[in-house]
Amino acid sequence: TKIRFYGGRESLLDKSQILLQADRGPGEELTEGISASLTASAMSSLSDSCAIVLSDYDKGVLTTEGALSLIKAAGDAGIPVIMDPKLTGLEKSRGADAVLFEIRGLGLLQRRLMASDQSEAAKNLIETYEWGAMLVLGGVHGVTLYQADGETMHLPCSAVAPIQQIGLHDAAATALAAALGNGHSMTDAATLAAAACECVLSAEASHEFVNRTTLGVWLDELAWQLQISDR
């Protein structure tokens, strides 16, 4: 069970905004038996799934063996896998179709790899771990897609007044799963993920959700931007 705390100071800001997030959970890892049971349960649900999202909190729920077995089984079944990995457990994501990163995380790996820029770091990581693509979430800096074939696409953030960013990973993972699971291309999936992230950035609070009309407006704006930039 994870307990989440939020803190902020409204006197310093024009609007209320989350400044601090602290998560508290059990310190001990789960037993291997529980992890194996959860993996087996996920494996049995593959036939009824159109996509798989694996999110690693490094608490023992997702082991390297379990993650790789799910990725292989999904690949054999033609089911796309979206992975939200820990930087210290990238081996668990080997072979995933799409991997989520924050811009700060990629910057850290860039320094570790001594790459000249984030593009080179992304290329190195994609080749090393055999990913299909990497989607980098930059918040107000937009979303960048790096693909195994070398193609790169950047989607700038068009949110007029970004308020918060709690939930970006969940929004992006859900959008990728919905798009890839319904047979859309990786670029289309990244576009939907960017729109979902902008909805989160513009939400009054992390519990606020948008309807289909609002999301459609974001997608129309992104489509127009891509059209005028010949992307």
Locate each region found by the language model.
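Conserved N-terminal subdomain of the carbohydrate kinase-like
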Residues: 1-53, 208-230
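Long hydrophobic segments that form regular secondary structure
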Residues: 51-54, 60-62, 67
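Conserved structural-core and active-site-/substrate-pathway-adjacent residues in large, well-folded domains
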Residues: 3, 52-55, 102, 170, ...
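Conserved phosphate-binding/catalytic region of the ribokinase-like
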Residues: 29, 48, 65-80, 85-95, ...
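Short glycine-rich anion-binding loops that position phosphate/pyrophosphate groups of nucleotides
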Residues: 57-60, 87, 105-106, 140-141
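Short, basic, glycine/proline-bearing loop/turn elements
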Residues: 23-26, 55-57, 104-109
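Non-cysteine beta-strand/loop elements that form the S-adenosyl-L-methionine
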Residues: 96-104
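Structural motif
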Residues: 21-23, 50-54, 82, 100, ...
